[in-house]
From Swiss-Prot:
N6-succinyllysine carried by residues: K13, K67
GO terms under biological process: lipid metabolic process; mRNA catabolic process; mRNA destabilization; negative regulation of translation
EC number: 3.5.99.10, 3.1.-.-
Domain of life: Eukaryota
Catalytic reaction(s) noted: 2-iminobutanoate + H2O = 2-oxobutanoate + NH4(+); 2-iminopropanoate + H2O = pyruvate + NH4(+)
Modified residues (N-acetylserine): S2
Tissue specificity as recorded in UniProt: Expressed by various malignant neoplasms.
UniProt-recorded name of the protein: 2-iminobutanoate/2-iminopropanoate deaminase
Subunit and interaction comment: Homotrimer. Interacts with YTHDF2.
Species lineage: Eukaryota, Metazoa, Chordata, Craniata, Vertebrata
Gene3D superfamilies: RutC-like
CDD domains: YjgF_YER057c_UK114_family
Molecular functions per Gene Ontology: 2-iminobutanoate deaminase activity; 2-iminopropanoate deaminase activity; mRNA binding; RNA endonuclease activity, producing 3'-phosphomonoesters
Length: 137
């Protein structure tokens, strides 16, 4: 049996990890993207403007990590959205639809007690490298 390859994905175009974890890990063709806050990669600080701007930045960060792995948002098969306030669900959905426009990935959304750096939204994703064909069952 051949062993699977595990590769760390990293880019300066997304914020550096703020703890002992990688931006993303690639195993075989599956990319596990760590939760992204609405942090500006240059400053390491949350972007101003509230949950909408934080969601845009978090998804932009995910997009940069996907690019570093040779992928884009069409490769995402699962996302998890963590919200400091579940009342922001609709506002974040409006932003989310700007990045995922068709063949939406599976997703879960949860309200949590708190997020790092006082963030209002954190998004993580799982993607699969390579061309994907969408088929209906």
């Amino acid at each position: 049996m051949s062993s699977l390859v595990r590769r760390i994905i990293s880019t300066a175009k997304a914020p550096a990890a703020i703890g002992p974890y990688s931006q993303a890990v690639l195993v075989d063709r599956t990319i596990y993207i760590s939760g992204q806050l609405g942090m500006d990669p240059a400053s390491g600080q949350l972007v101003p403007g509230g949950v909408v701007e934080e969601a845009k930045q978090a998804l932009t960060n995910i997009g940069e990590i996907l690019k570093a792995a040779g992928c884009d948002f069409t490769n995402v098969v699962k996302a998890t959205v963590l919200l400091a306030d579940i009342n922001d669900f609709s506002a974040v959905n409006d932003v989310y639809k700007q990045y995922f426009q068709s063949s939406f990935p599976a997703r879960a959304a949860y309200q949590v007690a708190a997020l790092p750096k006082g963030g209002r939204v954190e998004i993580e994703a799982i993607a699969v490298q390579g061309p994907l064909t969408t088929a209906s069952l």
